[in-house]
Amino acid sequence: MYIRKKILFIFILLFSFTVFTQDIEEIIVKGEYREKSIIEEDSSILIIQSDKIKSQAIKHFQQLSYLVPNLNYAASDSRARYFQIRGIGERSGYQGTPNSSVGFLIDDIDYSGQGGIATLFDVDQVEVFRGPQGSRTGANALAGLIYIKTKDPTDKFEGTSELTFGDYGTQNIGVAFGGPLNNEKMKYRLVMRTDYADGFRKNIYLNKSDTSKKDELTLRYKLDWEIDETTNINFLVSKVDMDDPADIWTIDGSLNTLSDRPGMDSQITDSIGIKIKKNFNNFDLQSLTSSTKTDVVFSYDADWGNSDSHFPYTYDYFSETLRKRDTFSQEIRFLSKNKDFSQSNPLEWVFGFDFSELDESNLTKDDGVYGDPSDPFGPYVSESSISRNYKSENLSLFGNIDYFLTNKTKLAFGLRLENWDSKYKDSNNESFSPSDNMSGGKISLVKKTNNDSNIYFSIARGYKQGGFNLGLDATDNLVRQSLIYDPEYLTNYEFGISLSLIHI
């Protein structure tokens, strides 16, 4: 694991070190507009490569998060979907706008707010950017960005497999293989992975030991096609199916549950991504297109018990939320060639535009009954349901210029302008249509002191789109407008030193 810790300078200067040997190969940051050495990075970043992931026997990103300083996650009964960096981020997503403070990208596909799919089999490396990434990602990265890069197809055929058995019915089976096709201009990689475990809890009322199980499937197929010397197409399709029942809450704090209606915390996500790269004489063109479809079931036994455990009272409540989320994104980038001092070209630039849309629907149903044997008017039955629909569109223009004062000193400017439009409506007749224009950016100065260390200063501004407050049954337009809140902004001042000493 290579840790590059950046130092926030307020009144006291704190030193931290990137550690690896001089003989190790160069570490490349892959989550930026263009790949670059970690020594050129101007923000607080931590990179965990595949060898470290394998050595830790880590199956999911939420387990990996224990190795990342300043990163926390929030989970209900199953996998973590929400993350916080430096204390900023969501802990749940029951209602309102599904805005994320921490961006979550896998192979350049945005899964922000859907982190449950982050299984780590056949992953190349994980990058965690701490601090606002307003110029790089936009509204979903107020606090930072998590970028996961899976392994790409290789020029020669290769494969890997994993088989694990353990306590509590644990079974992990994974296989990944690929290489060139008959036409050497095409190469592929196929990944299949299943993870199963009964869980640590036993439902003694139903006499079952798998009501908190993990039953997860990961499928991924990558195809790289080199059409000619200047054109390359990368195709990706993936499916993650997480069938994870939710039965962990206990009345007495033990590992034995008493629920008579165990819930579910499942997620199925289908994704497709197409990346086109075209090289011209003076610049490169990149097109990134992606689409995701997600179905989530989140339910739980709200009384944690059964008719026997609550006797002589009648106490039985259950809640279920069915969520569907569809996303689409199209990004176009124009990138300059690398700097060339021999040609009096000290600039590297990128500019482009990004369009994304999100369509999410939620159906929440709650039912329950309560009865007291001493109450002549009981029992009391309650039933409620609400459907919510939210749509949003984001259009942004972005650019970044790296001006190399010398071969070791770089001044960088980044800017993103973003327009956001949204519509919300629910079955309680609440409706909102907030919109806004937002901007973020970054300016930094980086100086390499030698081949494996640098010093930098940066000012970064991130943003997060606004939203609205629910539950007031507002039908008057004037009242509704008063319930809409503005976007959030975060400005980060950072002074950092990176030193490379030893390898862990």
Locate each region found by the language model.
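Flexible loop and strand-edge segments within Gram-negative outer membrane beta-barrel domains
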Residues: 232, 236-269, 309, 314-315, ...
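N-terminal periplasmic accessory domains that precede
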Residues: 27, 62-64, 82-84, 128, ...
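Transmembrane beta-barrel wall of Gram-negative outer-membrane proteins
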Residues: 158-160, 165-197, 201-244, 268-270, ...
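N-terminal periplasmic "start-of-domain" segments of outer-membrane beta-barrel proteins
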Residues: 26-54, 81-84, 102
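Short acidic/polar hinge/loop motifs at secondary-structure boundaries
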Residues: 93-94, 101-132
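Extracytoplasmic beta-strand/coil segments of soluble accessory domains associated
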Residues: 62, 66-107
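Structural signature of Gram-negative outer-membrane beta-barrels, strongest in the C-terminal barrel
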Residues: 224-230, 238, 334-337, 346-348, ...
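Surface-exposed extracellular loop regions of Gram-negative outer-membrane beta-barrel proteins
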Residues: 183-202, 216-218, 247, 284-327, ...
